[in-house]
Every structure is written in structure tokens, then in C-alpha cells.
């Protein structure tokens, strides 16, 4: 049976509940229903969860409407939350709330079993589904009487509430895990509870608790974690227990990094490890190795590029190709493309014993050829220049003359 609960700060009057419904916490369970009405709504939502989302929303609303009408004969509009104790809400809001609720149920029941964990949360970088409360054993320190969960997470200002509302991972009803990770409390404050939901709560409590937070928010792009039954893989619970995360289920997040840097961290770590490996490889070789091409363990392109840079450092830095360039014919396109296809092949295939002097001579030859080429191209460009220079001048003069003519005519 679903348990109705009230907004803590709003005072639970009609104005607060309707405004919360308008502000996007669209769920029929924000509003103080009588328990029978809310249970009928939840049962209709469960029964219609297997149908398509649009039809199921309409059927759920009609079911709820019929049950509400049977309770109070004076209500005629088809609204599931319209009870005598409340001012009526506009029907489209209620329909939208029901639709969201049913879609949440559906996505939880038919979610593909691809990922085993909810996505990384911005405010808590524990990934396992059962971090704070291991599935098998109920939490020893939890209160015997769980408090009614609250829709607002006791922030001081509403902006923070909205910020965290967008980035909630969507919990599954059978998770005893935290549905709303709270932001890091100040370190001087007494430890906040890491989650609102305790293992003793019924599974119906969770949809109430998570529905106000939208469908997973924009941050996760509609991803809802697949249902993990209470008998979750023992591997995850035991491995996360091995790291000692279960020891302090109520302590503040002392081990979390700054909220938004958590998703970025693995990528940075990967890049750093790769570059470290390359640097280590480079440092193991001797200095002479770097200068001459006699090393037997020329492994990566990285190292190859580094050594190549080392012994071409003294020469001109801006080179057209690394390889040897055959003298060009008049039609430069064919040979140009063929030589650009294998830029490194010639220097790569030098025998291991070529000394630095030989390679230096080769490079001197290449640079001479290159200078000759450049001079040729400069000469060509200078020939072309007068022709190409006359056209723009002619055009600009013509345009200016036309403009002056227009002005004079005015």
C-alpha cells in the first residue's frame, strides 16, 4: 500500500502542493491524498505498466478517476488526485504526472540488462548499486522506525534543490541503495544520512521518493539503471565491502572528490598512464641510443618520432616531408602525391648501422633540393603576381567608380 507524505516546508496546504506540481515535481504522490486514493492510483499504474506509455497513461487516469468518483460522487472531472479535501488541479498536469509515473514503472520493468550499475553520480562517486546498504544483510545502524522520506533534501535555497534534481540517477524500487545522493555537507556539521531510504521500507515507498526528481534528469540523457533484484550479484556487494565503504553508512562523503570532476577523472587517469608508460620506455634507453639509430627495441611510433626530432633538431624545423624527395618533373602532381604517401619510409628503412654523419649528409641533400624547389616556386609566383594583381585593382576601381556615380546622381 502506498504511503502518502507531505512537503516539509510547504505546510501541506493546497497552494504549496499545487505549486510543487506546477514546478515540475509532477507526481500524484506529492499531494496529501487519503491513503485509499493513492493506493488505487498506484495499483492502476502498476496494472497498466505493461502497455505502451501513451495508452497506459490514459488508462491509468481513467482508473484513478473511476475510483475517485466512487468515493466522492460530487466530483465529475476525470482527475485522479481531485478529492474533496483539495482544490482541483488542471487535468493536463495530472495526466502528465500519471504519464511520468507510468513511464517510470515501465522503464524499470523493461530496462535492458546491459549495465550493472547506475551511472556515476556528480555528487557521489561510488558506483555500485548497493554501496551504502549491502543487499544481503540489513543495515545494523539504521533506525528501527524509518522517517517518512522528504521531497526536499534540506538545502538552504531552492536553486541547489533544482540543481540536484536535474542530476539524479533514477533508482529502482527494489534498491535499498540511496535514491538521492545528497551534496557534501560542511565538514563541521553532524553527519547527514547518506540516503533517505532504509532497507525496512516497502518497495512502494521508492517511486514516491524518486518521482519528484524527474526522469533521470538531463544529465543522464534518459538512462535508467536496470532492475537489480535484492539478490544482486554477490561479487559487487562483496567487492565494495572489501573497500570498507559499508563501515560508515551515515558519515558525510569524505572520500568524494569535487562533484563535477568525478566523471572526468578516469579519462585523465588513462591519458596520464599512457604518457607515463611512453616516458618510462624512453628513459630506459641510453643517451647514445637516442642520437643514433642503433637501438634494437624501436617499439612505438612515439619513440621513433622523438628520436627523429632529436637528430633533425639542428636543421630547419619546417620540412615538407620526412622522406627523401625525388627530383620533380614538370607535372608535379603525380610525383608529389606518390612521395607524400610514404613520408617516413626512406628514413625508416635505413640499416641499423647508419651513423649520424650519413643521415646528416642525406638530410643536407634533401634540404638543398628543397631550397631549389622553393626558389622555383617563388619565381613562378612572381611571374603570376602581375596578372593576378591587376584583376583585383581593376575590380575595386570599377566598384569605386560606380559608387561615386551613384552618390553624384543623388
UniProtKB/Swiss-Prot annotation:
GO biological process, one term: instar larval or pupal development
Biased composition (Low complexity): 13-27, 35-70, 134-145, 230-242
Consequence when changing residue 171 to S: In allele A22
Compositionally skewed regions (Basic and acidic residues) per UniProt: 292-301, 371-380
Positions of region (Disordered): 1-88, 126-207, 230-301, 319-386
Biased composition (Polar residues): 71-88, 149-159, 343-358
Phenotype seen when the gene is deleted: Mutants contain extra cells in the head owing to decreased levels of cell death and show a pronounced defect in the morphogenetic movements of head involution. Ectopic expression in the retina results in complete eye ablation. Reduces levels of caspace-3 after exposure to ionizing radiation. Simultaneous knockout of hid and Clbn/NEMF has a similar response to single mutants after exposure to ionizing radiation.
Molecular-function GO term, any one: ubiquitin protein ligase binding
Compositionally biased region (Pro residues): 170-189
Residues carrying Phosphoserine: 295
Keyword set, alphabetical order: Apoptosis, Developmental protein, Phosphoprotein
GO cellular component, one term: cytoplasm
Domain of life per record: Eukaryota
Similarity remark: To D.melanogaster grim and rpr.
Quaternary context: Interacts with Diap2 (via BIR2 and BIR3 domains).
Function: Activator of apoptosis, with grim and rpr, that acts on the effector Dredd. Seems to act genetically upstream of baculoviral anti-apoptotic p35. Blocks Diap2 from binding and inactivating the effector caspase Drice. Might regulate apoptosis downstream of Clbn/NEMF.
Name of the protein in its database record: Cell death protein hid
Amino acid at each position: 500500500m502506498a504511503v502518502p507524505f507531505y512537503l516539509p516546508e510547504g505546510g501541506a496546504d493546497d497552494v504549496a502542493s499545487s505549486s510543487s506540481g506546477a514546478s515540475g515535481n509532477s507526481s500524484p504522490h506529492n499531494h496529501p491524498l487519503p491513503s485509499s486514493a493513492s493506493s488505487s492510483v498506484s495499483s492502476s499504474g502498476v496494472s497498466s505498466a505493461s502497455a505502451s506509455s501513451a495508452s497506459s497513461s490514459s488508462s491509468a487516469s481513467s482508473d484513478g478517476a473511476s475510483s475517485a468518483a466512487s468515493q466522492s460522487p460530487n466530483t465529475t472531472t476525470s482527475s485522479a488526485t481531485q478529492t474533496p479535501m483539495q482544490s482541483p488541479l488542471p487535468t493536463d498536469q495530472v495526466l502528465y504526472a500519471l504519464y511520468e509515473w507510468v513511464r517510470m514503472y515501465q522503464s524499470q520493468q523493461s530496462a535492458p540488462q546491459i549495465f550493472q550499475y547506475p551511472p556515476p553520480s556528480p555528487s557521489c562517486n561510488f558506483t555500485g548499486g548497493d554501496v551504502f546498504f549491502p543487499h544481503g544483510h540489513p543495515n545494523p545502524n539504521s533506525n528501527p522506525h524509518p522517517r517518512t522520506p522528504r521531497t526536499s533534501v534540506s538545502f538552504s535555497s531552492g536553486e541547489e534543490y533544482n540543481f540536484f534534481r536535474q542530476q539524479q540517477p533514477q533508482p529502482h524500487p527494489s534498491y535499498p541503495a540511496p535514491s538521492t545522493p545528497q551534496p557534501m555537507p560542511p565538514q563541521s556539521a553532524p553527519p547527514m544520512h547518506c540516503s533517505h531510504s532504509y532497507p525496512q521500507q516497502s518497495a512502494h515507498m521508492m517511486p514516491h521518493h524518486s518521482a519528484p526528481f524527474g526522469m533521470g534528469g538531463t544529465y543522464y540523457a534518459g538512462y535508467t539503471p536496470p532492475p537489480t533484484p535484492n539478490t544482486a550479484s554477490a561479487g559487487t556487494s562483496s567487492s565494495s565491502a572489501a573497500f570498507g565503504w559499508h563501515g560508515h553508512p551515515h558519515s558525510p562523503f569524505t572520500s568524494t572528490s569535487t562533484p563535477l570532476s568525478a566523471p572526468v577523472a578516469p579519462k585523465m587517469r588513462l591519458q596520464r598512464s599512457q604518457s607515463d608508460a611512453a616516458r618510462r620506455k624512453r628513459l630506459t634507453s641510453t643517451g647514445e641510443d637516442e642520437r643514433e639509430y642503433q637501438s634494437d627495441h624501436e617499439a612505438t611510433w612515439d619513440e621513433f618520432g622523438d628520436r627523429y626530432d632529436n637528430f633533425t633538431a639542428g636543421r630547419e624545423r619546417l620540412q615538407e616531408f620526412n622522406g627523401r624527395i625525388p627530383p620533380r618533373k614538370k607535372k608535379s602532381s603525380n610525383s608529389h602525391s606518390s612521395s607524400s604517401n610514404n613520408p617516413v619510409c626512406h628514413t625508416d628503412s635505413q640499416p641499423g648501422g647508419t651513423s649520424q654523419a650519413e643521415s646528416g649528409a642525406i638530410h643536407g641533400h634533401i634540404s638543398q633540393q628543397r631550397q631549389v624547389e622553393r626558389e622555383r616556386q617563388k619565381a613562378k609566383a612572381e611571374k603570376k603576381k602581375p596578372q593576378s594583381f591587376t584583376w583585383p585593382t581593376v575590380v575595386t576601381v570599377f566598384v569605386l567608380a560606380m559608387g561615386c556615380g551613384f552618390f553624384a546622381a543623388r
